């Protein structure tokens, strides 16, 4: 018996991995985060028990996993995006270890990747930014020392900010001294879902643009020069003079 923490991807059912889809269709027990996982992902399952965990607390979820273990039944524990990023699987894994229950993490497509695809851009451009920082706004969960937005902004790297659209004004206030008012920003709401929306602007004008769209949750904020960069240098990867194992020199 194994508990599979499966990344369902950002919303589009076609973006789940082949392995994740196969496990959902094979496992006799499915626990899924119904608030963020589309029902279409569960199509074709043969499970005898399917539970939406949106209204359950940690203790109740762990008990369901333990019950499945006692019955010798594999569990598809389906999370949105990639479960290793803000998936709250750490505390579940801790309980599984204490109970001696095997588990496996099946990666998923991240919201950041889906947003970059929607925007049609690369997040790491030569001589513009080679660093992408995934972070969140500090609301109920406090940030460790040195990880405030102000601290991270000093690097001027590309930022992907989760769980922050409701606090956008404070985010802009913290970033402005480091990035400047002209720094490009994109706010993507429900990336890859049928009703996905995007708003593009700068730190200087993004607030009224987002307010007009009334985004409340399930939005990602991307910040950085890569979002509007033009005339950047080509990478060395495909340069004719660049030699490597598959393109050796003569």
UniProtKB/Swiss-Prot annotation:
Entry-linked PANTHER family: COBALT-PRECORRIN-4 C(11)-METHYLTRANSFERASE, SIROHEME SYNTHASE-RELATED
Keywords tagged on the record: Cobalamin biosynthesis, Methyltransferase, S-adenosyl-L-methionine, Transferase
Catalytic activity, reaction form: precorrin-4 + S-adenosyl-L-methionine = precorrin-5 + S-adenosyl-L-homocysteine
Enzyme class: transferase
Organism: Pseudomonas aeruginosa (strain ATCC 15692 / DSM 22644 / CIP 104116 / JCM 14847 / LMG 12228 / 1C / PRS 101 / PAO1)
Protein name, as recorded: Precorrin-4 C(11)-methyltransferase
Pathway: Cofactor biosynthesis; adenosylcobalamin biosynthesis; cob(II)yrinate a,c-diamide from precorrin-2 (aerobic route): step 4/10
One Pfam family matching this protein: TP_methylase
Family statement drawn from the similarity comment of this UniProt entry: Belongs to the precorrin methyltransferase family.
EC number(s) recorded for this UniProt protein: 2.1.1.133
PROSITE patterns: SUMT_1
Single GO biological process annotation from the record: cobalamin biosynthetic process
Gene field: cobM
Phylogenetic classification of the source organism: Bacteria, Pseudomonadati, Pseudomonadota, Gammaproteobacteria, Pseudomonadales
